[in-house]
C-alpha cells in the first residue's frame, strides 16, 4: 500500500473523526457528566476506575500507531444504520431516563462514527480499545446492592 496516499487519507479522516466525536460529546454532554460524576465518587469506589480504563484505552490506541498508519481509512456508508441505531438507543433510554443505557448508546455511537468514517479495517484495529471503555460504564450499578448481599451471604 502506498504510504503517501495512506497519510493523505489520514489527514482527512483523522480531523473528520475528531470533529464528529467532539460534536457528539457536546450533544450528549449530559451522559458524559453522568459518567464522570460516577467516576469522581471516590468514597463509593464502584466506578472510580473509569479514568484508568479511559487511559488504558488511549494507550492501546497509541500502541497501535504503526498498524493504524499502514491502514488506509475508507469511509463505509453501510455503517450509517449503526449510527442511527445507537442514536435511537440513546434517545429511547433518555425518554425513559435509564442512564446506564444512555452510556451504552453513547459508546456504541462512538464506535459507529469511527466505523462510518474510517471503515472496516481501521475499525477492526480499534474495536478492542473502544469496547474496553465499556468496563468504565456502570452496567452492573443497578444490581450492586443485590450482588453485595449475595456475596455477603456466601461468605
Where are these regions (language model features)?
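Hydrophobic N-terminal alpha-helices or hydrophobic patches in metabolic proteins across all domains
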Residues: 1-155
